[in-house]
Amino acid sequence: MRDFDKWLAAFRPSIADYKYYVDFDKVFANVEAIKIPLNILNSLIGTKNIEKEFEAILKQYPETLKCIPILLAKRELEIMAMDDEGQFNFKFNRMNYTVSDYTKFMRKTGLFDLMENHIVNNLVDYVTGVETGLDSNGRKNRGGHLIGERV
């Protein structure tokens, strides 16, 4: 028979160890995987002709397309969007709409405002913050594993 008083007395106010809060190895690896395309997109920060420059970047460096979802805190490479013109399912692993449609997407989501108004200075740093925030969901999993180890 189990002594529940002894078992309950062994509880601590927290199960968190130092690695519980953020898995920075994962964050840095995710950012590193797209660092070069992000730095290409950095050229849009503060530009006055962002739409034309974005279209030129997409044509010359189509691999930059895969960076756009994480700028919206999305890991999936497909994003649904609706407006007065209809429903769109944008793909970011390869273009399934025109460059002009992706330009409209950037404008309507606010990403162009973020860049052209210099709200952020560096997309690599910005995405590091986004990845850190998204990793909070991983904290739930880490918490479950830590509890499992203790029980």
Predicted regions located by residue number:
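Catalytic core segments in nucleotide and nucleic-acid processing enzymes
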Residues: E149-V151
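Nuclease-adjacent, charged terminal/linker segments that flank catalytic cores
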Residues: M1-R139, G143-L146
